[in-house]
């Protein structure tokens, strides 16, 4: 189970299992290649994490009064990449809505308000969640 221990904000955040979603996103984003880069080189690793997302995760940690910080190299580390995914979800998708979380990963937090964003990506990820190759 892929979870991230946070402060005692909400038990559901701590116990929600994102592993199936993360596994499908990894398949879509990099096919499991930790050294994958997109065409412009900004998105890196199994989850194709941008420098902006690393910075946002560090801002979230700072707001939690945590001393932990992520580096750009952490995008190539599977465990740390998954931690960043879960941290981002815990901040911007506290209800753990899977569809919102998938769309948000692809389109950013604006996808939380505009449900039309990321539909194609959502369908692609859900295909892998449902056992597609």
Protein language model annotation of sequence segments:
Residues 6-12:
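Sec/Tat signal peptide C-region and signal peptidase I cleavage site
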Residues 14-19, 40, 95-98:
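Extracellular/periplasmic catalytic domains that process cell-envelope and extracellular macromolecules
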Residues 16-33, 49, 85, 100-108:
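Short, functionally critical alpha-helical segments immediately adjacent to catalytic or ligand/cofactor-binding
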Residues 17, 45, 117:
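Short acidic-hydrophobic sequence patches enriched in Asp/Glu that either
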Residues 24-63:
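Secreted/periplasmic proteins that engage bacterial cell-wall peptidoglycan
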Residues 51-114, 122-131:
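Alpha-helical segment that forms one wall of the substrate-binding/catalytic cleft
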